[in-house]
Amino acid sequence: MSFQRDYESEWNAALIEEYGEGGSGFSHGRFASLRMCEQRLYRPPGKVEEGTVKCPGCGSRRVHALQRQTRSADEPMTLFAMCSECGKRWTR
């Protein structure tokens, strides 16, 4: 017998109950407006110097990157990056 809850299923069921069908998790249509706001509001600084982070899309080193602690303190920080050449965004 498992005492672990399936939070992902509960989350998806709550989304469907509240907003109807349209995807699961953060791919649900309810979050589309939040994704658009993030894309409009997040702008890297104008000129980006060549650095140490390499874009997996085009290989450029002109990448705007910042780190934030998104998990517990014993976990590594999360890197949020955006390539100034091709516009690719990723986290690591």
Swiss-Prot record:
SMART domains: ZnF_C2C2 (SM00440). It comes from the Viruses. One of its GO terms (biological process) is termination of RNA polymerase III transcription. GO terms for molecular function: DNA-directed RNA polymerase activity; nucleic acid binding; zinc ion binding. It comes from Frog virus 3 (isolate Goorha) (FV-3). A zinc finger (TFIIS-type) spans 51-91. Pfam families: Zn_ribbon_TFIIS (PF01096). This is Putative transcription elongation factor S-II-like protein 81R. Zn(2+) binds at C55, C58, C83, C86. Keywords: Elongation factor, Metal-binding, Protein biosynthesis, Zinc, Zinc-finger.
